[in-house]
Amino acid sequence: MSERNAASARTVACLLGPTASGKTAAALALAARRPIEIVSVDSALVYRGMDIGTAKPTRDERAAVPHHLIDIVDPADAYSAAEFRADALRLVAQIAARGRTPLLAGGTMLYYRALTQGLNDLPAADPDVRATLDADAARDGWPALHARLAGIDPATAARLAPNDSQRIQRALEVYLLTGQPMSALLAAPPRDNDAAAGLRFVPVALEPSERAVLHARIAARFDAMLEAGFIDEVERLRRRDDLHLGLPSMRCVGYRQAWEYLDGCTDYRTMRDKGIFATRQLCKRQLTWLRAMPERIVVDCCAPDATVRAVDALERVLDGRAPA
């Protein structure tokens, strides 16, 4: 964005951070001071019936402050970054038109990048292609499909673990639909970003000064989810004939581990440990994305007054006192 366009653009504050960094507390604290509406930037919160394992805001929290892009999709359905971008831009405009302040808050960095940088020309998901790949994986295993991907798109395969089923499937799907490797398509310039041209997104990032503190929070939160009935929640989902572990919804952190426990593949302790480890890995990926944003305003989420600091940073952004 040019200096002239930046000066005339409407600022949109964004509260980003990894799992368990305190985003909800900071957003609600800001809502006590300003007439905000929260637009969720979280790929797990879109799914209905997945409340405990996604740490969805409570009914009281959602009643106190308007929340958007929560409970909008059935777990049997997909929701893409392109759909998020269109929905988020529409909501930002509608909230501003009501005389209120939009606050984007969440930790799905792919969504944030799609919103702020636009999208490459990747094809939409194809159920038939995905069904074929799922069948191949059931027969041969995801490491075999990872090896297949390495033969056609070594750059993408190199950054994926052999069991990263969701991303391996997507990379193979893109190749089968376009005949081109995903790495080549992603290297192309994004499509025009006209819909966001009048907006200036400013990220406030909650990041840990001590990784061990965040890891302890993650473990405590996962244990609290288990005590709150997470296994029962997954069991209800598992009883549905139209849900399976290959769906994006069931790839949300914790759900696969709980499902496999219910299938008898692991014991309770192993399920817990795997769930916590998967959450820590998600946190690591989120921090990698954040640290690639030089424009972000960093708040130490481990500080005793982290919520106060985050609210202060967000208010500086909204008042035009943040660095340009």
Swiss-Prot record:
Name assigned to this protein: tRNA dimethylallyltransferase
GN (gene name): miaA
Superkingdom of this protein's organism: Bacteria
Pfam families from the UniProt entry: IPPT
Keyword Cell inner membrane listed: no
Residues that, per the record, bind substrate: 19-24
Residues the record marks as site: Interaction with substrate tRNA: 108, 130
Function: Catalyzes the transfer of a dimethylallyl group onto the adenine at position 37 in tRNAs that read codons beginning with uridine, leading to the formation of N6-(dimethylallyl)adenosine (i(6)A).
Catalysis performed (reactions): adenosine(37) in tRNA + dimethylallyl diphosphate = N(6)-dimethylallyladenosine(37) in tRNA + diphosphate
GO molecular function, one term: ATP binding
Alphabetical UniProt keywords: ATP-binding, Magnesium, Nucleotide-binding, Transferase, tRNA processing
Residues involved in ATP binding: 17-24
Family matches, as HAMAP family: IPP_trans (MF_00185)
Region: Interaction with substrate tRNA, residue numbers: 42-45, 166-170, 251-256
Gene3D superfamilies: 1.10.20.140, P-loop containing nucleotide triphosphate hydrolases (3.40.50.300)
Gene Ontology biological process terms in this record: tRNA modification
Its EC number(s): 2.5.1.75
InterPro entries in UniProt: Dimethylallyltransferase, IPT, P-loop_NTPase
Organism: Burkholderia mallei (strain ATCC 23344)
